[in-house]
Amino acid sequence: GGVDVEKKKFNLNEFLLNYALYIILGLMIIVVIIIEPGFLHPSNFIKILTHASTRGILALGVAGMIVLAGTDLSAGRILGCCAAVSASLVQATTYASRMYPEITKDLPLILPLAASILIGVAFCALNGFGVAKLNLHAFIVSLGTQTIAFGATCIYIDSQEGGAQALSSFNEKFLNFVNGSFKIGSFELPYLIIYFALSAIVMWVIWNKTTLGKNMFAIGGNKEAAAVSGVNITK
């Protein structure tokens, strides 16, 4: 009987330790519902998901670093740099203070998207080279990359004619792509939520159904054991 009590007590402690954040979050939600019953309205959840979608997509990328038992301080700054470049390419042609007045027609959305991806890949390749080839700690490498990305963003925005100013007045094609929604009767599902859901599905498949994903978990769990097992930890 004493053994069973100790086992139950241990399980309870383990449960609280593993799910403390979820319990606290649940209690916070209950308090908010009591204070503001309108919190449970479906439209409110749609708004929350919409605002969280961009951060969620960023979090999926950072999660890859966590799986590898690493860290990335530069993700936010790299995102900002990508956003600045892509935003400058989708400004409305009727906006007099646009960054590129020589662009007289709306560019295909694939171009700013490709520019963002290339910038992100370049910075991440720099991080990867520093960690894998130079054997530097990910914290130090990403700290430096963070500074470089922020500096590059400031220089880019300041290069506008007349000096630095906010990038605004985007074309309708871009606004519809970002702020549009999929309508089913009276129900509207913002595109941002769909983009996040698709990204999450892709990442889930990569992590759980591919050799790459399994190797990532192996390296994150035990780098030396993964290397002995034949996993190319540098690649």
Model-assigned labels for residue ranges:
Residues 11-18, 43-51, 100-113, 178-192:
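Interfacial loop-to-helix junctions that mark the boundaries of transmembrane helices
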Residues 201-235:
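Membrane-helix/interface signature in polytopic inner-membrane proteins
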Residues 94-146:
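Alpha-helical transmembrane segments within multi-pass membrane transporters and channels
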Residues 18-26, 48, 56, 77-81, ...:
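Hydrophobic alpha-helical transmembrane segments
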Residues 21-34, 62-63, 87, 117-120, ...:
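Hydrophobic core segments of alpha-helical transmembrane domains in multi-pass membrane transport
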Residues 134, 139-210:
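Transmembrane helix-bundle core of multi-pass membrane transporters
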Residues 27, 31-94, 129-136:
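Single transmembrane alpha-helix segments in multi-pass membrane proteins
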